[in-house]
From Swiss-Prot:
It holds the Pfam family PQ-loop. InterPro entries: MannP-dilichol_defect-1, PQ-loop_rpt. The gene is Mpdu1. The modification N-acetylalanine is found at A2. Keywords: Acetylation, Membrane, Repeat, Transmembrane, Transmembrane helix, Transport. This is Mannose-P-dolichol utilization defect 1 protein. It is a multi-pass membrane protein. Required for normal utilization of mannose-dolichol phosphate (Dol-P-Man) in the synthesis of N-linked and O-linked oligosaccharides and GPI anchors. GO terms for cellular component: membrane.
Length: 247
């Protein structure tokens, strides 16, 4: 029975969270302070946690838009630039065969960001434009994932993530500052993005060793931190028309 239980436990960890040599090091030899293997376990665990959490990260934002039937306070340009950055990460990671645990959340965030882009257009009375956007985006994504796309183009797209993230977040920050409130921006989504990007700095260094990936997450953390700070600063601020209704 003990052997069966050990086998099941090993099956849960190897190779999802640990390579076999690290499993032996930690759970057979009981060398629980083996730093390299502990780093792998922490990185894989964090990575899979981030991927699982990403399924829900932007849903509060989607539901807030649907509930309010308004995209007030959201910068479409900012959301679009975030989509460019996420798409670059997905394509670059697939092309380089990085472990799914090191980038999987980008795929789920991409799908949710596409939905937000469409909803922003829809609630601005541009539904046809939104449908056209969905079709165009699907074609561009298929083209980028095609073997015909040169690696240099994919690398350039990933390198463009840094300016895309910076400009996109600054546009949203400027919109918040100009409005004096954060409108329909979801605080839950903002804080989850901030926490996820911080954790990704460690996991990207540990799992991919790619300085470009790590650099993108460092910049993303700084920019997400700025938006999170604005959410806290404008926590009790409301749009002028809402203030009038309350009066």
């Amino acid at each position: 029975m003990a052997g069966e239980a050990d086998g099941r436990f090993k099956g849960l960890l190897v190779p999802i969270l640990l390579p076999e040599k690290c499993y032996d090091q930690l759970f057979v030899q009981w060398d629980l302070l083996h730093v390299p293997c502990l780093k792998i376990l922490l990185s894989k665990g964090l990575g899979l946690g981030i991927v699982a959490g990403s399924l829900l990260v932007k849903l509060p934002q989607v539901f807030k838009l649907l509930g309010a039937k308004s995209a007030e306070g959201l910068s479409l340009q900012s959301v679009m630039l975030e989509l460019v950055a996420l798409t670059g990460t997905v394509v670059y990671s697939i092309t380089n065969n990085f472990p799914f645990s090191s980038w999987g959340e980008a795929l789920f965030l991409t799908l949710q960001t596409v939905a937000i882009c469409f909803l922003v257009m829809h609630y601005r009375g541009e539904t046809v434009k939104g449908v056209a956007f969905l079709a165009c985006y699907a074609m561009v994504l298929l083209a980028l994932l095609s073997p015909l796309t040169p690696l240099a183009v994919v690398t350039l797209l990933q390198a463009s993530n840094v300016p895309a993230v910076v400009v996109g977040k600054l546009l949203q920050a400027a919109t918040n500052y100009r409005n004096g409130h954060t409108g329909q921006l979801s605080a839950i989504t903002v804080f989850m993005l901030f926490g996820g990007s911080l954790a990704r700095i460690f996991t990207s260094v540990q799992e991919t060793g790619d300085p470009l990936m790590a650099g993108v997450f460092v910049v993303s953390s700084l920019c997400n931190g700025l938006i999170a700070a604005q959410v806290l600063f404008y926590w009790n601020a409301k749009a002028p028309h809402k203030q009038k209704k309350e009066q």
